[in-house]
Amino acid sequence: MSLPLDVILEDLESSPKSIIPILATLHRDKAFLNDISKTDLKHLVSRSLNLSKSHIAYNKWCGINLIKVLSNNYNILANEGVNFMSQLIKILENYNQSIDPKILSSTVECLNNLCNQIRGKPTLTREVLTPKLPTIITLFMEKVAYQPSLILRSLNSLIRKHPTTFRPYGNKLRNRLIELLSSESYSAFPQELKQIICETLATLPIIEKTEPEAKWQGDIVDIVKELSQVLLIYDEFLSLNDDSDLMELFKKIPRTRESEESESSFKFASLEIDINKPDTIFQISDRVELLLSIMKAYLLSETQFSVRVPVGLVLIINEIICSISTKFVPFRKDIRDEKVKKLIKSTTLLNQFNSIKLLSELPIKYQGSLVPHLNNILAFLEILIPFSNKKIDYQEVLSNEIFMCRLLECTGNFISLVSSLSDASLLIRFIDVALCLVEERALNTSPVSDGKKQNQQANGNKKKNKKKNKESVPLSDLLSHQHLFNETIPLSTLNATRRFLNMVITRVNLPPTQHYRVFRYMIIEATVAKSYNKDQNISQELKQLLINSVLYPGFEKNSMLPIITSLLGDDPLLSVFNNPRFPPLPTYIKKSGSVIEDDEEEEESENEDEEMEENENDGSLNVDEESQLESSAKRRKIDISESSAGGGSDQPETVLPGIVLEDTKTKEKIFTNVNPDSVIQFAETSEIVEDVVPEPEATRTEVVTKSSVGTIPTPENPVATSVSVSVDKNEHDESDFEIPDIDVGDDSDDE
């Protein structure tokens, strides 16, 4: 519901009782500001500016937000944009620590909105924004200590949108950011602030006048060099030279020359580590975390120019971080203090955790570029899994549960780059870790009770106390209600494990042992979800895992479909397995005769059908329609004619009779020797010729020519007839051909 203009103007004349309805009316009703008169509009703008000039914090805040809403209207922005910008800059200049922080945040947000509304409009940009940009940048850099996250995000936007204007302020901002990164309180900064500092630093190469891509790549190399120098500090505590592979990796890192040290983009203070002050050892892990955060910002932030990313160099430095571990590299002999050893081990774990956070983001950004390095990445991630006596250290896995979940997430991200992975041995240990994390966790017996038990065994020869043993009461509860003493697995751990297993079973053919362990876990999860979940609320990760267990059964002979269907009965994919919906079967159309090649043959086939109907009516042939079609398809047609070389011969055409056998499957055709004196020639025209063979054993046979292809009645005991036709030797074909005699049986007409 919008307020009338008179009410708004009256309320803005002094301190507004409630600014929210006024702001809602001006923001939602787009036609409100277009329909009011110029006089009322001038009153509205002037009273908003007067409120922003007030010394009362509430009135100032109301005036700033009114300017923000009014600037969304183009007509007001074109006429009053300069006044709005000048008033906001004045508020920003006069801000100090004694003023309410909300005034600063509202002013910065209003300036950002005003710049966004003006940007892209050439006239307004030239007249309003461009002259004020240097002042805005300077004030933002001066006030960055009051609202660092908000102001740095605003500066980051100005760098991207106005790199040329920002160029004179680039070095000053870089030094300011390096000071923030080097401060002792950096580790206590909020994670959001750390991220925006690194992103702003990674955006600065865009202001370079020439070759910004070379500057960007040089910064990446400088970060890698700085990391290698920090990691070499561990050589004072660990015997790094004993690991030849590790030293080979260090040699692949470019060396920093003395002349290049002054040109390095990242100049941090030197680390002061005292072995007598073990807490100073954490400076190593803090510096590694800082450098990895900057590298992450460089690798993930978008640029307006093409860059060459040294992916191999980035992976090498991460492999070095993962390889520096007390499991593989022994301590030096002069390091004997157990406290120092534990602190060094803790710093290496922190370094590895920060490295995994960086590696987890790379597949999302670079995708296929990492596939050639996939086996190498999985290999050095595998060394992070704790082992004891060639088995996974269960207690160590649980004590570093967050680290292990992040490791599984990182591994799953790299597996997702490929559709299938042929070498399943690379993932066996990761699967074992995942299954360890989701096993039931029973609460261990406390050390106090263990100590008492040992004391009781040591003093067994003493007189037993006749008093009632009070310790038996809690022990009885432990035996009778053991399920109440199981530790609950965190939901984040369950989701991370399910996502990893879901990624594995869809891309890898696991060995039988790991396959059955994974499917055993899925059956247990499905049974628990069915029996103990009254609301049938199933997480998305578990739902996807159960569906994929049906789609990718692997070695499983018995399907999990019945159990999963009882849980996910409404799933459309599972309904296809339960009620298959196949397409209709194809319908075969019977062919009705021989293939017709042209229109003439089509007409002949019609005549043929008429003849067949007449024969059926006379009762001469008692066969059904299918046998007629079959005999018609199998019939052989032979046309015989005579023609002279000069074309004047009166010799009539002679056509060879067509013979159709009664049973072609049981009777064989026996051919006689060909008589070279007999020649057969096909006639150019065709007609039905009835010929009577003078031989006593032959019967009258109806000969079929090309013009009639109907069904021919066959006598019960047909006798083959040989017809010999003599043709003049002057014909083109001088060969002789004799129609063979066909013996169809021993029976004759005499019987």
From Swiss-Prot:
Keyword field: Nucleus, Ribosome biogenesis, rRNA processing
Biased composition (Acidic residues): 596-628, 733-751
UniProt keyword Repeat, yes or no: no
Keyword presence, Cell wall biogenesis/degradation: no
Family: Belongs to the RIX1/PELP1 family.
GO biological process: rRNA processing
Region ranges (Disordered): 447-473, 588-659, 693-751
GO cellular component: nucleus
Name of this protein: Pre-rRNA-processing protein RIX1
Compartments, as annotated in UniProt: Nucleus
Major subcellular site: nucleus
Pfam family, one: RIX1
Compositional bias of kind Polar residues: 702-711
Assembly mode: Component of the RIX1 complex, composed of IPI1, RIX1/IPI2 and IPI3 in a 1:2:2 stoichiometry. The complex interacts (via RIX1) with MDN1 (via its hexameric AAA ATPase ring) and the pre-60S ribosome particles.
Role noted for this protein: Component of the RIX1 complex required for processing of ITS2 sequences from 35S pre-rRNA and the nucleoplasmic transit of the pre-60S ribosomal subunits. Regulates pre-60S association of the critical remodeling factor MDN1.
Stored InterPro entries: ARM-type_fold, RIX1_N
